[in-house]
Amino acid sequence: MMRVRFPLLVLLGTVFLASVCVSLKVREDENNPFYLRSSNSFQTLFENQNGRIRLLQRFNKRSPQLENLRDYRIVQFQSKPNTILLPHHADADFLLFVLSGRAILTLVNNDDRDSYNLHPGDAQRIPAGTTYYLVNPHDHQNLKIIKLAIPVNKPGRYDDFFLSSTQAQQSYLQGFSHNILETSFHSEFEEINRVLFGEEEEQRQQEGVIVELSKEQIRQLSRRAKSSSRKTISSEDEPFNLRSRNPIYSNNFGKFFEITPEKNPQLRDLDIFLSSVDINEGALLLPHFNSKAIVILVINEGDANIELVGIKEQQQKQKQEEEPLEVQRYRAELSEDDVFVIPAAYPFVVNATSNLNFLAFGINAENNQRNFLAGEKDNVVRQIERQVQELAFPGSAQDVERLLKKQRESYFVDAQPQQKEEGSKGRKGPFPSILGALY
């Protein structure tokens, strides 16, 4: 594993472990600039009885601290069984990920089309300007998809261009003048209007951009679809499955699946990594930080407490040298569809309060290094020389080494015994419990 130059990063880790001993500010939930609650952070772009499309608010509108994510958006798509999202394209690149259900994704090119059967864990890049449509072929199960959108025309803004004219959406072809349409299709406008748009307003499809399909239509569409690639994660233009290979971290308390840009050309083009993480109820994903990637975490199933540690903003201003370092702790209780942003170099920890699954998009992912602050393996603190440990911590090098070796698990640990013990002692708040679970 690559060695990291870590003086500043280790300082952050040291701050995390010692944060109960320095000036500490806590920001929770609604005052937390990195937390986007599902109930009030999504805008519904379309909804009917067949499904809905929601767009997360712009990250930099949530907080100036998220300015570096101004070019990224999160889109949530859900559809009922036996439905289709009608053909359209957008002025944005998409990285699509199937959270649950099955799908048939069709990508249309000038002289060809490709259809793929998608399953949970499948991912696919949809290049900007590509016409595509999405079918839920299942008879009983809803389809749930999350997309990372990267607009190409305007920072943080993109438009969907639908071919169909519905009650919810005009066909973009209707933007052309009558004579242009007549010349282009070599037909009278009356025929064009009747065939493509509906001769009268009331003749338009009423369901909107997500409509029902018959069993025969689904059967025909399914026949043309190819299965996603589960043998390789390095596909240049076909879907790949995030969970088809062994997890990079795994034990009895959790599993961590990841594909990095170095392993997949689609992710390399976007400079993004994809992670899918399972954590058992009561378990902890140990404190760690990413060296350069900004992580957008999306809760798929379950609930969790998350704690993030940063340096208070005023530390960036000119200050008297004798002023103490001030640490900011950001807490949030996360539920399904909530989004949390983890800046690069900020240590964080996730405590699952029920069986948990979350997806993570890592922005600026190339050559990112994940540095754990506790646990037996990949622990950056344990790599510090003994002489430096004695200078960095109040305890002796022997005490530090003894403390670090107490935690024999790596990556995921069981926090429940510690939480129960401290609950019986009357301790309040999750932070001491989390620290106690580490060592």
From Swiss-Prot:
Keywords: Allergen, Endoplasmic reticulum, Glycoprotein, Seed storage protein, Signal, Storage protein, Vacuole
Domain Cupin type-1 positions: 34-193, 240-401
Mutation effect (I145M): Little or no effect on the secondary structure and strong phagocytosis-stimulating activity
Any Gene Ontology CC annotation: endoplasmic reticulum
Predominant location category: other
Protein localization: Vacuole, Aleurone grain; Endoplasmic reticulum; Protein storage vacuole
MF (Gene Ontology): nutrient reservoir activity
Domain of life: Eukaryota
Signal peptide annotation: 1-23
The keyword Mitochondrion appears for this protein: no
Post-translational modification: The N-linked glycans are not essential for the folding and assembly into trimers.
UniProt xrefs under InterPro entries: Cupin_1, RmlC-like_jellyroll, RmlC_Cupin_sf, Seed_Storage-Functional
Glycosites: N351
UniProt region (Disordered), positions on chain: 411-439
Effect of K147 to T/F/W: Little or no effect on the secondary structure and strong phagocytosis-stimulating activity
Tissue: Expressed in seeds. Not detected in cotyledons or in mature plants.
Region named Necessary for sorting to protein storage vacuole: 430-439
Miscellaneous remark of the record: Mutagenesis of Ile-145 and Lys-147 allow the creation of a beta-conglycinin beta chain containing a phagocytosis-stimulating peptide, soymetide, found normally only in the alpha' chain. The three mutants created exhibit phagocytosis activities after digestion by trypsin and the order is wild type < I145M/K147T < I145M/K147F < I145M/K147W.
Family from the record: Belongs to the 7S seed storage protein family.
Quaternary structure annotation from Swiss-Prot or TrEMBL: The alpha-, alpha'-, and beta-subunits associate in various combinations to form trimeric proteins.
Official protein name in the record: Beta-conglycinin beta subunit 1
Name of the coding gene: CG-4
